UniProtKB/Swiss-Prot annotation:
Protein name: Fluoride-specific ion channel FluC
Record GO terms (molecular function): fluoride channel activity; metal ion binding
HAMAP family tied to this protein: FluC
Functional description taken from the UniProt entry: Fluoride-specific ion channel. Important for reducing fluoride concentration in the cell, thus reducing its toxicity.
Lineage start: Archaea, Methanobacteriati, Methanobacteriota, Thermococci, Thermococcales
């Protein structure tokens, strides 16, 4: 690991975190459901699936691009800790059904969107 690679992850991660801050601020909650977090996790999952789909289907994506976009940007954009805290808060507030919906929506949507991005990268 060299300093240039660390800088790529740092800049990509910072950019992703700023995008997350903006996007989750635009749609923070809808009837106690944390839409903003679902949006950023879904977008990051799709982008990461697309990036690795491009690589799988033969596009030569440089290590630097993978570090900046995959590890950095997508890592900074997505937020497992916020998802976990919001789910915990919903449970604490007695919103059990909403908490369960949040868990299923985040897990199923993000896995599906990685798959979709991967498949769409082939075209």
């Amino acid at each position: 690991m060299d300093l240039r690679e660390v800088a790529l992850v740092l800049i990509g991660g910072g950019t992703g975190a700023v995008a997350r801050y903006y996007l989750s601020g635009v749609l923070p909650v809808y009837r106690s459901f944390p839409v903003g977090t679902l949006l950023v996790n879904s977008l990051a999952s799709f982008l990461l699936g697309y990036l690795y789909g491009l690589i799988f289907w033969g596009l030569d994506v440089s290590r630097e691009s993978r570090l900046f976009l995959g590890t950095g940007f997508c890592g900074g954009l997505s937020t497992f800790s916020t998802f976990s805290y919001e789910t915990f808060s919903l449970i604490r507030e007695g919103e059990y059904l909403t908490a369960l919906l949040n868990i299923f929506a985040n897990v199923l949507a993000t896995i599906f969107l990685v798959f979709l991005g991967f498949v769409l990268a082939r075209r």
